[in-house]
Every structure is written in structure tokens, then in C-alpha cells.
């Protein structure tokens, strides 16, 4: 019989099996002076189809002594990095923003977990901005680590993130709201109402910026309006990929 930890919100429930741990390997692409170790943990989580899928997360332990009542965990949920496997934070150099946050957390004695999210760094398509998928990547990552090293952790954990990670933090707070060991979420600039931003807000703002740059005779290669428009198109493509991950019949032309 498999023991599980139940996490639920509203009518949605899912379980984190005790055997969700797959393996752990050293992370060797970058270093952080404040970290005693940086590893890549592979674990099982349900994908958007409800099937078991591998997921990965960076796990950073501090150099300080383990508290008498066990380690506490802070999960860092990253912002938009792209949708291809090679974009996964665990396959890249450490982001500078993440380094700043991780240094402070490690100095304070926290274990830091940074999930890649479903479909990043592993097989499958990344369901960009899928709230439930992001929340599961976080919760399964935390519970897997705590289950694997059961005697070393206090149980208490929280989540913090920015941009896409801000949305992931809010989603985690929804799905973990009945978990008494979950202590809170910090969401910086969470992704929200992107359809309205892309279709209504951004075109007006970019048009005004373009007019200003034209009047100033700004060279094409130096125009922020052009670079911003290209970025906007990229986000649109990411969103399309995210929808396609869950709905393969989605037509990009729609």
C-alpha cells in the first residue's frame, strides 16, 4: 500500500506518493558560495493529462548546521525563461536574480528548491502559465524532498516567485491551502490577464512609444518599440504552446 500526502483545493485533490523520488545528481554548471551543495532532483508529478511524468528541480542546502527541529524550505518559482527543454534553469547558469534571493535564503538557513516546471528540461511540452501544473511542480517537489529525507526536515515551507513564478506562487497557495505546513506565498508581478495585455493594453502603449521614437528620429535598431513588440510576439507564442500542451487540437491560427 502506498502512503500519500493529500493536498486539496475546492473540488480538486491530488496526492504526493512516497515513492515520487527518482534520483539526484550534482549541478555543475555554476556555483554559489553560500550553498553547501547544489543538486538536481528528478521526481514524478502528474502532467496536464494526469499521467506520471518526470520533473526536475534545483535543491540548494545551506552551509549552516541543521536546526534541531529540522530544515525549513523556501521554494523559488522562476519567471519566464522560454518553453524548450534547454531553457530549464537546472540546465543553465544560475539566474542573477535567483542568485540574490538564494544567497539571502541560504544565509538565513533555509533549504531552497527551484522547480523547472513540467516539460522544461525533461520530455514533454511545457504548459506555459498552466496554474495547476505549476502548483503541482512545486508541491510534488517539496513533498518529494521532505519524504526522501524525512528525518531532516521540519515540514514548514513557503513559496516565492516573480512574473510566471509569481503566478506559480499564487497557484501554489490555492492548491496548498489545506496543508498546515504551508506557511505562505510571495508573488512578485504575477502573470495575469495576458490576453487583455496582449490584445488591448500593449498595442496602445507600443503605438505611443513608436510615435515618440519616430518624432525623435530614433534609429530602427535602437527603437524600444520594435524590441518590445518582438518580446510581445514571443509571449504570444509561449501561450499558444502552453495551450497546445493540454489541448493538442488547438489551432495556432485561432
Language-model features and meaning:
Residues 80, 111, 116-120:
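Short beta-to-alpha linker loops that shape the active-site pocket of alpha/beta-hydrolase fold enzymes
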Amino acid at each position: 500500500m502506498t502512503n500519500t500526502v493529500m493536498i486539496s483545493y475546492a473540488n480538486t485533490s491530488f496526492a504526493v506518493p512516497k515513492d515520487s523520488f527518482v534520483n539526484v545528481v550534482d549541478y555543475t554548471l555554476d556555483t554559489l558560495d553560500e550553498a553547501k551543495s547544489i543538486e538536481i532532483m528528478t521526481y514524478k508529478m502528474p502532467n496536464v493529462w494526469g499521467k506520471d511524468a518526470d520533473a526536475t528541480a534545483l535543491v540548494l542546502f545551506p552551509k549552516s548546521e541543521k536546526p534541531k527541529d529540522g530544515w525549513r524550505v523556501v521554494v523559488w518559482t522562476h519567471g519566464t525563461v522560454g518553453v524548450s527543454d534547454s531553457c530549464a534553469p537546472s540546465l543553465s547558469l544560475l539566474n542573477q536574480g535567483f542568485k540574490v534571493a538564494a544567497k539571502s535564503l541560504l544565509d538565513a538557513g533555509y533549504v531552497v528548491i527551484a522547480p523547472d516546471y513540467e516539460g522544461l528540461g525533461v520530455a514533454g511540452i511545457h504548459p506555459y502559465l498552466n496554474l495547476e501544473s505549476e502548483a503541482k511542480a512545486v508541491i510534488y517537489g517539496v513533498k518529494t524532498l521532505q519524504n526522501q529525507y524525512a528525518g531532516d526536515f521540519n515540514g514548514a515551507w513557503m513559496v516565492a516567485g516573480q512574473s510566471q513564478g509569481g503566478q506559480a506562487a499564487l497557484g501554489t497557495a490555492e492548491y496548498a491551502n489545506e496543508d498546515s505546513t504551508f506557511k505562505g506565498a510571495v508573488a512578485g508581478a504575477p502573470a495575469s490577464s495576458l490576453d487583455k495585455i496582449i490584445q488591448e493594453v500593449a498595442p496602445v502603449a507600443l503605438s505611443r512609444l513608436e510615435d515618440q521614437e519616430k518624432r525623435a528620429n530614433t534609429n530602427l535598431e535602437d527603437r524600444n518599440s520594435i524590441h518590445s513588440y518582438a518580446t510581445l510576439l514571443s509571449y504570444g507564442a509561449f501561450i499558444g504552446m502552453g495551450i497546445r500542451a493540454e489541448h493538442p487540437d488547438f489551432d495556432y491560427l485561432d
